[in-house]
Amino acid sequence: MRALGFIGIILSIFSSFAYASEAKLDTGNTAWMLVASALVVFMTVPGLALFYGGLDKSKSILNTIAMSFSAFAVVTLTWIFVGYSVAYGDDIFGFIGNPFQYVLGKGISGINSDTGYPALLDLMFQLTFATITTALISGSFVGRMKFSAWILFAILWSVFVYPPVAHWVWGGGFLANDGALDFAGGTVVHINAGIAGLVGALILGRRKDTSLIPNNVPLVALGAGILWFGWFGFNAGSALGANESAAWAMINTTVATSTAALAWMFTEWLHVGKPTVVGISSGIVAGLVAITPAAGFVNLIGSIFIGAIASVCAYFMVALVKPKFGYDDALDVFGIHGVRGIVGAVLTGVFADPNVGGTPGLLYGNPKQVLIQIEGVIATILYSAILTAVILLVLKAVVGLRVSEEEELELDSSLHGEKAYNL
């Protein structure tokens, strides 16, 4: 009996070790990350699709919406097959993750001990970032790109461009090791997409009619509102839990976005004499983009400055610089996402508050952080520009990129066999 009792004690000790090693489900974090993932899906379909659709011409609104919807569907599959592995697999020379590690969810199971939610949920949350980043690029291409070429571009770009940059910053790559700060995707999402959009606009060439006359301003405003709402999942969700960091990200997102909307409105009012709803909506997106890299790193004063500075810079890029140089970035993806992403990323290195995110920026005695941020900006610009150009030039040679001039006149009818408004 004594022997049995001794064995029981030994087994209970080992059993306690086993239970101690098992991560426990944090239901609060799990619930929040499920909601955050759904919010980012809502940003893309329908938020981005409606925002872009309202900005575009009536003859191609359906094509514009289809580009966002199809990008989400296509990238969902590329992400679970290879994208997640490249972004978050075991590091290879600081550049990519093991591309075979998590194919179709292989090896993703159990509870993440760091976050307390199922590891599979991270696959879903990060999927939403990959999908919206690819969809963002479509705004530069609308009005003249073959739909088949767009599908092929979305496949290739979501495999060869987005995942490596995500790995550099969030997957243990060289920028992460250097200490680059990007809370929710200033470099990974917005600079990456903005530069790809600019390169694509240059390679595709100008449309026959390059005027920006929105076909449905209320749709633009509705899309901007949905983007703002969904962005809470984007930024606050990047805290990876229901915690103080998420609260900082949410309030900073609100403050920067409000500041940016006002900055754009008053700048436009002074410049052209009237504040427009499209301008206010663009200012909203300006603030959302600019605060993305800084959301969990800066205090409220920092978020005000970031929102205002980025919005004014983006306004002059869209209103003055683009017309002067004549490139046809149809819906201002470079001006809205590229420029604001760059400004936001650099200013994160200026305003980062150690009392918020643990890392000091220039104003808190760490000027080196600005240089690290600039390193991330330059690396992303170069990589995105070169790889995007290669992908588009290959597609141009193999399948062609542009529709015919006749198809461009009535793009929805020629590519999709339908019209948005049957009046």
Swiss-Prot record:
The keyword Transport applies. It comes from the Bacteria. The chain crosses the membrane at residues 31-51, 64-84, 123-143, 150-170, 183-203, 217-237, 246-266, 278-298, 301-321, 331-351, 374-394. The keyword Transport applies. SUPFAM superfamilies: Ammonium transporter. GO terms for biological process: ammonium transmembrane transport. Its main location: membrane. One of its GO terms (cellular component) is plasma membrane. Keywords: Ammonia transport, Cell membrane, Membrane, Signal, Transmembrane, Transmembrane helix, Transport. InterPro entries: Ammonium/urea_transptr, Ammonium_transpt, Ammonium_transpt_CS, NH4_transpt_AmtB-like_dom. Residues 1-20 form the signal peptide. Coiled coil: none annotated. GO terms for molecular function: ammonium channel activity. It is found in: Cell membrane. Pfam families: Ammonium_transp. It is a multi-pass membrane protein. Homotrimer. Belongs to the ammonia transporter channel (TC 1.A.11.2) family. NCBIfam families: amt. Involved in the uptake of ammonium/ammonia (NH(4)(+)/NH(3)). This is Ammonium transporter. It comes from Aquifex aeolicus (strain VF5). The gene is amt.
